[in-house]
Amino acid sequence: MVVARLSKFYFKNGKREEGFSELDLILNKETRSVKGFRGYVSMFSCDQANLITFLTVWEDDESFLASQQVFSSAVEKVMPLVERQPEVEHYRVDTVNFEQ
């Protein structure tokens, strides 16, 4: 069963780009190395200037749980840049379809 973590980061004014750079670096290095990592989507809100949402996709609950340490480390690194703790939700993925 494929699962996902949806994380919303609310950055302080003027810190969204810096925070994104830090999180994107972590996603591209550390997160990809966790067994069961399937991919991610990063989304800049068009409605809220300081919001970035990340969706990471995992092979199963086991790999999702194994990624928790990397996620916690990433949150810790950007805490000086955010207004509050990120909002995090755990999902079961039913369908993914990206057309080219």
Please place each PLM-identified region on the residue numbering.
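Glycine-rich beta-strand-turn "strand-cap" elements at beta-sheet edges
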Residues: 1-4, 9, 38-53, 76-100
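Short beta-strand-to-loop capping motifs
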Residues: 8-13, 56-60
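Short, surface-exposed ligand-recognition loops at beta-strand->loop->(often short) alpha-helix junctions
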Residues: 10-23
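Residue-level signal for secondary-structure boundary sites
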Residues: 15-17, 62-64, 96
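Residues in and immediately flanking transmembrane alpha helices
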Residues: 21, 52, 72-73
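An amphipathic, aromatic/His-enriched active-site/gating alpha helix that lines ligand/cofactor pockets
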Residues: 25-38, 57-90
